Amino acid sequence: MTMKVAEKDVLVHCHHVTCSYGDSAVVSDVNFTLRRGEFAGIVGPSGSGKTTLLKAVLGSIKPVHGSIDMLKGLRMGYVPQVESVDWNFPVTVLEVMMMTRSEKKWWPRITTAERAAAEDVLERLGLGGLSGRHIRELSGGQQQRVFVARALFHSPDILVLDEPTSGVDVRTRHEVLHLLADLHDAGMSVLLTTHDLNGLAAHLPRLICLNKEIVADGSPREVLVPDVLEKLYGAPMHVLEHGGMPVVLDHSENPMVGRFGGKAV
């Protein structure tokens, strides 16, 4: 059941949420609150329920138990995994932007006002002049920016992203991280999923550690620690501090600990 919350700073509140596929619980008894202006990441191993929980927040699946309460009139902008997109689909950047118009018939004529609004969002995200380009012709970082631009087209209250750095190179990952940080600095609330502990999660203000249930919830310094990570991944994990940030190594990488110039946490 989804209800509306009254507190103006609370955007989403998950209350004892359980989601199942058949008889198998994928997410179990999850509780967390996301407030306006927060930047939070849901982290965990493959199959931990990250995407399922995100879909429940988006309203595309219903919890079998518990409730998800949302601010009345909450607008969400969703960015899917880029890996899930068929790049052979013959569309331009502008046409991708127009796919948000779900209330209209398929492939309607693009009005002058809609084109101008789309161009404005693209310009703000560093994509000015690319609206007529085929989406496949763009770099990985540009493609991800296009989907973020599409999510921002209708001025959402919160940006929701599923694995925004999955399958991208280091340069694109940095571009995405800086883009999201800039949007957050401008006042956007952000909720994302990621399995990228060092490249993305360690840079976020808040991490919700999920393995079917919430294992920990806090800052990277609070949750990227060996005892929490072992509960989360079911295997020993080693953590270093390097440049003032936690660096997570799995058990197989422990022999390399002394070569990083950092100290164990």
Model-predicted segments: where are they?
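Conserved ABC ATPase "signature" region
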Residues: 98, 112-130
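Conserved ABC ATPase signature
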Residues: 134-138, 142
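Catalytic Walker B motif of ABC-type/P-loop ATPase nucleotide-binding domains
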Residues: 159-162
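Helix-to-loop junction immediately C-terminal to a conserved catalytic motif
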Residues: 58
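Helix N-cap at the start of a conserved alpha-helix in ABC-type nucleotide-binding domains
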Residues: 170-172
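ABC ATPase nucleotide-binding domains
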Residues: 225-226, 232-265
